[in-house]
Curated annotation (Swiss-Prot):
It comes from Xanthomonas campestris pv. campestris (strain ATCC 33913 / DSM 3586 / NCPPB 528 / LMG 568 / P 25). It is an enzyme of class 2 (transferase). One of its GO terms (cellular component) is cytoplasm. Belongs to the KAE1 / TsaD family. Its EC number is 2.3.1.234. Substrate binds at L138, V139, S140, G141, G142, D171, G184, N276. It catalyses: L-threonylcarbamoyladenylate + adenosine(37) in tRNA = N(6)-L-threonylcarbamoyladenosine(37) in tRNA + AMP + H(+). GO terms for biological process: tRNA threonylcarbamoyladenosine modification. The keyword Calcium does not apply. This is tRNA N6-adenosine threonylcarbamoyltransferase.
Amino acid sequence: MKVLGIESSCDETGVAVYDTALSGVPALRAHAVYSQIALHAEYGGVVPELASRDHVRKLLPLIRQTLDEAGLRIDELDGVAYTAGPGLVGALLVGAGVARALAWALEVPAIGVHHMEGHLLAPLMEDDPPQPPFVALLVSGGHTQLVSVKALGAYEVLGETLDDAAGEAFDKTAKMMGLPYPGGPQLAALAETGTPGRYKFARPMTDRPGLDFSFSGLKTQVLLAWRGSDQSDTTRADIARGFEDAVVETLAIKCLRALDTADCNTLVVAGGVGANKRLRARLQEAAQRRGGRVCFPRPALCTDNGAMIAFAGALRLEAGEHADAAVQVTPRWDMASLPPLAAARESGIGNRES
């Protein structure tokens, strides 16, 4: 089954083709992402109406480009998957409308995909994918969650942020220190040059039981340290390093607790912050110490993309799910409410070859 995936939940337009007849990395026939960073930079954040209009402009050309790269005609598609939520309602409707129209014209099934399930399943597109049960850390600009995955589609949220997501904290902290938009990647790059230990910030909510997160207090700590400093380039880098170390260590501590809670030894990390080099290294080290395994998608598939939507959609279409003809989106959507994917798992998609 060749499935077209469309991602338009926020400020990236993503399109991909996933082929279930193949396995591992080659199954992703083609994917392309258009980022709206330049469009929103002057506003210091995403403007929903501008995001929606830009998806309208970019989506169809990106579909044509992706099909060309995959070497496919549009009538060779067997299904269409699109992000149905969570996300910005206008942006979601653009992708959903195009997807439903294509599916109707091609007389193929369509499926709305949960954006965070797409992130969670992205590592399964790699060679030697992880198998349930595992714990997933979903860490991005809008979400920070620990999820127990007992089977594909069977999700239990073990903990989540009570305020800012980790990626949001990166972006806001960077903005406080005068770094350009988008701040998170800029702050991480700056932290590479900072002196470890010069600034040491609290590891929020690690001194008590539980798996929830809170990053708003850490953000305030950094603001006070910045305002009380000489605000030199060197100090900016040192504070960035201290902030990043605090976030990474907090995430690592909570991940290890979650593995103990779920009684498993495999950790999956996905979402934009999952591309952070220091986070990857720290979690790899922690997994090796306990004789476990940590799995990441390739960095290009950590941020929002159509590949994860095509893959998650392929799993659900193979399981016999499909959407009706209505164009529906769900801006707020609890992933735990999704139906299990036992049939898709039995089909072998995303499983190791025997």
